[in-house]
Amino acid sequence: MGTPESSREPCPDRILDDVGGAFAMGAVGGSAYHLIRGIYNSPGGARLSGGVQALRMSGPRSGGSFSVWGGLYSTFDCALVYARQKEDPWNSILSGAATGGFLSLRQGLGASARSALVGGVLLAMIEGVGIMLNKVQSTAHNEQFMEDHAATSLPYGMGQISGQSVPVPETSSSSSGSVSWFGSLFKKKKETEDHHSESRTHILESFDAPPVPTYEFK
């Protein structure tokens, strides 16, 4: 079964990929958040300008914070991949915990431990949801494949459920009615023409042909 790690970039390129994706996500999400917050906190008559100013001041900073987090996370992830020589959800969980703890070292060991716990739990939830979604998708795909294979391998009609009729292609009643009406009309016209031709032939055959004159003198 495929895991979310199997679809990611290789380790040297993974760091740059995650840094760029995290910066874009932080810039877009942070800009929207700070714009709404600036509009809400600004006085009446200057809400839009206050929101735009808050966006310009704090939007790029949010993107930078997210990019730093993404870069550290990918660095720890690649280090664990090379150390353990395999990729599994434990790499992501341990990388999230290490990233959270490393970013909070300036606040003390207690804050660093709490941040590491939060990061590990958050990544564990994300990995669990990803594994569940992959499992559900693979199960549905396998069931659909088995149904299609069974339907194609059975003879015609044996794959039908008891009491279920074999689907018959539907035809339009109006088109069939018009076709039958035109068909009956042309059939009647053809029968009438055939009747007239037969009567004409019968009349012509009823007259005997005149004898051919001979010019022999007796």
Curated annotation (Swiss-Prot):
<dbReference type="Pfam" id="PF02466">
    <property type="entry name" value="Tim17"/>
</dbReference>
<keyword id="KW-0472">Membrane</keyword>
<keyword id="KW-1133">Transmembrane helix</keyword>
<comment type="function">
    <text>Essential component of the TIM17:23 complex, a complex that mediates the translocation of transit peptide-containing proteins across the mitochondrial inner membrane. Links the inner and outer membranes.</text>
</comment>
<feature type="transmembrane region" description="Helical">
    <location>
        <begin position="116"/>
        <end position="133"/>
    </location>
</feature>
<feature type="transmembrane region" description="Helical">
    <location>
        <begin position="19"/>
        <end position="36"/>
    </location>
</feature>
<keyword id="KW-0812">Transmembrane</keyword>
<keyword id="KW-0496">Mitochondrion</keyword>
<keyword id="KW-0999">Mitochondrion inner membrane</keyword>
<protein>
    <recommendedName>
        <fullName>Mitochondrial import inner membrane translocase subunit TIM17-1</fullName>
    </recommendedName>
</protein>
<feature type="transmembrane region" description="Helical">
    <location>
        <begin position="66"/>
        <end position="82"/>
    </location>
</feature>
<comment type="similarity">
    <text>Belongs to the Tim17/Tim22/Tim23 family.</text>
</comment>
<feature type="transmembrane region" description="Helical">
    <location>
        <begin position="89"/>
        <end position="105"/>
    </location>
</feature>
<dbReference type="GO" id="GO:0005744">
    <property type="term" value="C:TIM23 mitochondrial import inner membrane translocase complex"/>
</dbReference>
<comment type="subunit">
    <text>Component of the TIM17:23 complex at least composed of TIM23, TIM17 and TIM50. The complex interacts with the TIM44 component of the PAM complex.</text>
</comment>
